From Swiss-Prot:
Gene Ontology annotations of biological process type: fungal-type cell wall organization
Organism of this sequence: Neurospora crassa (strain ATCC 24698 / 74-OR23-1A / CBS 708.71 / DSM 1257 / FGSC 987)
Induction text: Expression levels may be influenced by circadian rhythms.
GO cellular component, as recorded: fungal-type cell wall
GO molecular function terms noted in the UniProt entry: structural constituent of cell wall
Family: Belongs to the SED1 family.
InterPro entries noted in UniProt: Sed1/Spi1 (IPR038843)
Protein name, entry field: Clock-controlled protein 6
Taxonomic path: Eukaryota, Fungi, Dikarya, Ascomycota, Pezizomycotina
Amino acid sequence: MKFSAAAVLAAAAGAHAWSNVTYTTEIVTAVTTYCPGPTEITHGGNTYTVTEATTLTISDCPCTVTKPIITTSSVICHSCTGYVNSTIPAPTSAGSVGTGSAPAVVTPTVSPSEVPTAGAGKAAALSGAGLVGVLGLAAILL
């Protein structure tokens, strides 16, 4: 009984982690797609055969196109201090022969870089799945 309750809980949590996708539906007068190789596409009862790489336009519409809305979060820090790369060799002066002053030393400046956050949602989903697995294991052992 404990195992079946844990299995149901794990399945529900897994389904919930992937069910928060929002879709948008649009009715268009034509659909254009790129086919990289030979294929067959069935749309609205019609079959379109592509024999080589081509751009295919389906114009016997209205056609309903449903797409997921994908959101991406990113962080850009404009006030962060830059990272000084210590592997850049220090600028040197060749010196001059004769009179005059030595050339000015140029110090390289480094601009701040963007913080990569691509895939953070996937990591969050996987950590939730890991937590469900640990809870399931605890339920089995109890």
